[in-house]
Amino acid sequence: MTPKDFVTAYLPFAKIAEAKTGISAIAILAQGALESGWGSAVVGNSFFGVKSLPGALAADKQLITTTEYSRRQDLKFPVILSVTPVVRNGVKMFKYSVKDYFEKYDSAAECFEEHGNFFIQNARYKSALLVKSDPVKFLTAVAKAGYATDPNYAATLTKIVAMINKNI
């Protein structure tokens, strides 16, 4: 899916989520674009890469291959495919290729709605919610709070925000 197609298809859902939560629709689309590969890797309507909580019902989760970064070499996942030493932003880390459990949704609309609720219900994103109307500031704060393990997460999202703005 092209960035233009992604924006056309999912901006309505992002606008509904923005109206309910105040989180910028552009920020929502940027995160969805990155986490889903511009809609090319949407399994179980999971656009945002939200991991399932321990104890989640089997019907509400799915095992998906993903990449994680950590300074530790001893992390645990349901399935570890590989662990490779890497340097990211001048920091020695380990790149994990793993299978982990992620949320599953009945529809794209449900996923976009739950995306905003996720931030509101998790105290670690309190500072991000203070700047929720500014897509770059919000996404930078989300990255700083630990949403993703990739140290380049905020920079990548900032580039995607610019791409989305060109396609609205």
Regions found by a protein language model. Name each.
Residues 1-168:
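Catalytic cores of secreted/periplasmic lytic hydrolases that degrade extracellular macromolecules
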